[in-house]
Amino acid sequence: MAQNAVSELINFAELMRMSLDYACRHYERTPSGMIHPNVLAINVAKFHWASNYHAMVRHLHDVSGGLVITVPLEADLRNEESGKYLRKYLKSVPGAEPETRMRIYNLIRDLTADAYGGWQFVVALQAGGGLNAQRIMMHRTYPMADAKAKALAAAGVKG
């Protein structure tokens, strides 16, 4: 169902935005004074991105349909003969012009279904060392002792 796919896309976008916002607001400082985003938050965000990017592209393609790869050229729309048919068959809701729809389909294709899209499919997963690299960094940077102490305190156990 399209509404579910759109909800998944919203969820993904907002979790990414919130993760990156958190990483910047909770920046870290090196001994020399240089500031950088929170390492744990960045690795959690990267893990979320890499784990879910492919499913988000699938949702986008599901909502968009086959026109992502079959939409005619804008030159065909401007052609006197073919343009009248394209305007007729690419018509949807009032206010959604065929040229606008075509440009959106072209953008989706460019970002997800052509050479760049294929490259991005690999990079989304492998940039930064892949999922295992993010797992390692999360384990290295998560304040496990603090979490354990809080859990014990919540359970009424003296640590």
What are these regions (language model features)?
Residues M1-E28:
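Extended amphipathic alpha-helical segments enriched in small hydrophobics
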Residues Q3-E8, H36-N43:
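Short, charged, amphipathic alpha-helical segments
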Residues D21, E28, S32, I42-A45, ...:
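Polyanion-binding and phosphate-handling cores
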Residues L40-G159:
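Alpha-helix capping/hinge segments and adjacent helical runs
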